[in-house]
Amino acid sequence: MAADGERSPLLSEAGDGGAGGNGLAGPGGSATGPGGGLTPSAPPYGAGKHAPPQAFPPFPEGHPAVLPGEDPPPYSPLTSPDSGSAPMITCRVCQSPINVEGKMHQHVVKCGVCNEATPIKNAPPGKKYVRCPCNCLLICKVTSQRIACPRPYCKRIINLGPVHPGPLSPEPQPMGVRVICGHCKNTFLWTEFTDRTLARCPHCRKVSSIGRRYPRKRCICCFLLGLLLAVTATGLAFGTWKPAQQYGGIYAAWAFVILLAVLCLGRALYWGCMKVSHPVQNFS
């Protein structure tokens, strides 16, 4: 009975809505009202369910991104924020960009396209940069007037013109003489003022003599020495002809003297046939 009392308020509330609160539940799930009619005791379908959640309120209408009749904004490609942070320079030869990140401590960097050097810093004190027509970057003294390209296929002499150093410059202007090579007829600078007037041309890499005095003197000395040895060998041969037949070691002495005479005469021929390079101006 206690259980029926606990359930009664629920039934009475459902019945009060349709029969005034005095009806009883029948076996078919219906309650009998005062007038004898059957009234449904169960609530209508959907009455016991929770109400569906309401939708979110609509967003307030704002201005459109592009107004009618207005051009869209210009296109800008998305780039990485680090793409423009790396320091770049332009190659002085092929105009290609060169990334110098991590190379700022160097004076020059090498281009990855043309493999030529491009300076990124000023030259060291007392030096300057010079670019050869073959695109080779050279570094030389600020007082240099002529330099030679070190590349084997170039070997070009670059005339830098007169340089007037300041009064505080500790490096004197190089002294020398312009010489026309006796082999290739090119002009180069000769700066070795010694008794040996032999010079190697930077163009053809051949040795020649500056003037005729040095090779002529060497030729005369070698010729006279060779002539003296030849006369000595002849006299030795005639003087020791009979003893040489008994002692075979005398033939070795003949051969040694004759060999010295041939070497001296050959050296005299070398100096006599040496090419001569002529200077085009006096020593400065």
Swiss-Prot record:
Top EC class for this record: hydrolase
Molecular-function annotations in GO: phosphatidylinositol-4,5-bisphosphate 4-phosphatase activity
Gene that specifies this protein: Pip4p1
CC annotations in GO: late endosome membrane; lysosomal membrane; phagocytic vesicle membrane; plasma membrane
Residues annotated as transmembrane: 219-239, 246-266
Cell compartment(s), UniProt: Late endosome membrane; Lysosome membrane; Cytoplasmic vesicle, Phagosome membrane; Cell membrane
Motif (CX5R motif): 140-146
Example of a GO biological process term: cholesterol metabolic process
Function: Catalyzes the hydrolysis of phosphatidylinositol-4,5-bisphosphate (PtdIns-4,5-P2) to phosphatidylinositol-4-phosphate (PtdIns-4-P). Does not hydrolyze phosphatidylinositol 3,4,5-trisphosphate, phosphatidylinositol 3,4-bisphosphate, inositol 3,5-bisphosphate, inositol 3,4-bisphosphate, phosphatidylinositol 5-monophosphate, phosphatidylinositol 4-monophosphate and phosphatidylinositol 3-monophosphate. Regulates lysosomal positioning by recruiting JIP4 to lysosomal membranes, thus inducing retrograde transport of lysosomes along microtubules.
Feature: compositional bias, Gly residues: 15-38
Matches recorded under InterPro entries: PtdIns-P2-Ptase
Organism: Rattus norvegicus
Phosphoserine found at: 169
Membrane topology term: Multi-pass membrane protein
Region described as Disordered: 1-82
Enzyme Commission identifier(s): 3.1.3.78
Catalysed conversion reaction: a 1,2-diacyl-sn-glycero-3-phospho-(1D-myo-inositol-4,5-bisphosphate) + H2O = a 1,2-diacyl-sn-glycero-3-phospho-(1D-myo-inositol-5-phosphate) + phosphate
Active-site residues annotated for this sequence: 140
Record's protein name: Type 1 phosphatidylinositol 4,5-bisphosphate 4-phosphatase
Domain of life of the organism encoding this protein: Eukaryota
UniProt keyword list: Cell membrane, Cytoplasmic vesicle, Endosome, Hydrolase, Lipid metabolism, Lysosome, Membrane, Phosphoprotein, Transmembrane, Transmembrane helix
Subunit (UniProt): Interacts (via transmembrane domain) with ATP6V0D1. Interacts with LAMTOR1, RRAGA and RRAGC.
